[in-house]
């Protein structure tokens, strides 16, 4: 399984080498958190990982357009970053559509509020990867929740 790291920190470029040494395969960082976006992407690639940019709900998806040809993936946040258990923001799905239209080769990931009742709308929008935290870890049977999530996404 790929080790996918989502850095929710300021100046992520400073920490790239440490995460690569720890075995990260994919490293996502917030476009809003780094002045040297291109340099950070290049550093991720140089250490052998795949670069990804994350976009907060209030940030225009067009902010990542200049970097699409250098990226493996874009992470569209479907909650405000910071804590688990927030409500899924379905109004982020147009960002997914814009990304798929502009760069069909790119993987699109969503993170935030993913559950059995929200994963289908993400799948319909064209999302490739859904991050499910609270719905899995607070479930009475996490294994069953994962199976239910997979089924709900496939039934689209």
Descriptions of predicted regions:
Residues 27-35, 75-85, 125-145:
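Glycine-rich phosphate-binding active-site loops on the catalytic face of alpha/beta enzymes
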Residues 13-21, 59-71, 114-130:
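Catalytic cores of alpha/beta
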Residues 57, 63-103, 107, 118, ...:
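Glycine/Thr-rich beta-alpha phosphate-binding loop at enzyme active sites
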Residues 1-53:
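Glycine/small-residue-rich loop that forms an oxyanion/phosphate-binding "nest" at active or ligand-binding sites
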Residues 8-12, 32, 56-58, 79, ...:
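Active-site beta-loop-alpha junctions enriched in small/polar residues
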Residues 3-7, 27-29, 51-55, 74-76, ...:
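Hydrophobic faces of well-ordered beta-strands that scaffold small-molecule active sites
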Residues 44, 123, 137-156:
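C-terminal helical cap(s) of enzyme catalytic domains, especially alpha/beta-barrels
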Residues 19, 74, 99, 111, ...:
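Conserved, mostly hydrophobic/aromatic
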């Amino acid at each position: 399984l790929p080790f996918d790291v989502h850095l929710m920190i300021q100046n992520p470029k400073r920490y790239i080498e440490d995460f690569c040494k720890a075995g990260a395969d994919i490293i996502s960082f917030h476009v809003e958190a780094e002045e040297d976006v291109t340099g950070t992407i290049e550093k991720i690639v140089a250490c052998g990982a795949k670069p990804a940019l994350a976009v907060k709900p209030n940030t225009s998806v067009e902010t990542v357009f200049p970097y699409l040809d250098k990226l493996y993936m874009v992470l569209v946040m479907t909650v405000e970053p910071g804590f688990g258990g927030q409500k899924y923001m379905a109004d982020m799905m147009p960002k997914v559509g814009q990304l798929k239209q502009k760069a069909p080769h790119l993987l699109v990931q969503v993170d935030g509020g993913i559950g059995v009742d929200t994963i289908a709308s993400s799948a319909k929008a064209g999302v490739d990867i859904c991050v499910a935290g609270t719905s899995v870890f607070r479930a009475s049977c996490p294994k069953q929740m994962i199976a239910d999530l997979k089924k709900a996404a496939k039934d689209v």
